[in-house]
């Protein structure tokens, strides 16, 4: 019993240390049951609804990042998300931002005149919606105990998702906090390589 208690204390101490470094909330990449659903949300640039399946079409790996525009931890991750997107976009990697708990005007202000480098859609605009969004539900399923859960990242492999129905995938790799760049970079690289290796090129006459 004492040894078990000791392990629990060590785990909690390590978790606190990892999450508290320099105001960051880093979290490891883990596979979780999430029952992630398809959605249709309004695009920040076009002001028109976009369907997730449509955005994923033709991609090998998709990272959906949920964020609040006013959140300091999102401000920490945003450059990393943009960097990874620029590095791997030509290899079939897609980033999609889903804004939460802040107005679309605030989201536009955050990204500046150039706008976001990848598609951004809106799920909610009010802090009052904190416990009403699908984002909140996914966080509960994956054990995210943070107050706002920004950022929250989920990785989808389009080739392995359900092509019909509400639920895209039962399980997925998620990050309940800020990305650990080196870890996620390796994950993206290996998954893109695996996806490419699995592509069968038709014979040409």
Go through the PLM ranges and name each one.
Residues 36-62:
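A short beta-strand-turn-helix
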Residues 66-83:
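Conserved redox-active cysteine motifs that mediate thiol-disulfide chemistry
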Residues 114-116, 126-187:
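Thiol/disulfide oxidoreductase modules built on the thioredoxin-like
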Residues 63-64, 95, 153:
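Hydrophobic beta-strand anchors of alpha/beta hydrolase catalytic cores
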Residues 57, 76, 83-90, 112-119, ...:
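Sec-exported extracytoplasmic/periplasmic mature domains
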Residues 67-70, 96-97, 173-174:
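Second-shell loop/turn segments in exported
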Residues 86-133:
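Conserved segment of the thioredoxin-like fold in thiol-based oxidoreductases
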Residues 1-43, 185-189, 194-205:
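N-terminal targeting signals for export/organelle localization
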């Amino acid at each position: 019993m004492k040894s078990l208690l000791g392990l629990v204390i060590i785990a909690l101490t390590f978790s606190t240390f990892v999450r508290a470094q320099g105001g960051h909330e880093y979290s490891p990449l883990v596979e979780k049951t999430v029952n992630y659903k398809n959605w249709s949300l309004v695009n920040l640039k076009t002001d028109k609804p976009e369907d997730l399946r449509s955005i994923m079409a033709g991609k090998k790996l998709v990272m959906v990042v949920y964020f609040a525009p006013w959140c300091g931890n999102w401000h920490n991750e945003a450059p990393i998300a943009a960097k990874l997107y620029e590095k791997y976009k030509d290899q079939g990697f897609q980033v999609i931002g889903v804004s939460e708990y802040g107005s679309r005007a605030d989201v536009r202000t955050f990204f500046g005149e150039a706008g976001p480098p990848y598609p951004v859609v809106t799920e909610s605009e009010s802090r009052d919606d904190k416990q009403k969004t699908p984002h909140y539900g996914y966080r509960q399923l994956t054990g995210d105990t943070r107050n706002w859960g920004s950022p929250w990242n989920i990785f989808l492999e389009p080739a392995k998702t359900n092509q019909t129905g509400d639920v895209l995938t039962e399980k997925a790799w998620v990050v309940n906090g800020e990305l650990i760049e080196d870890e996620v970079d390796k994950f993206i690289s290996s998954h893109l390589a695996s996806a490419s290796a699995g592509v069968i090129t038709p014979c040409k006459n």
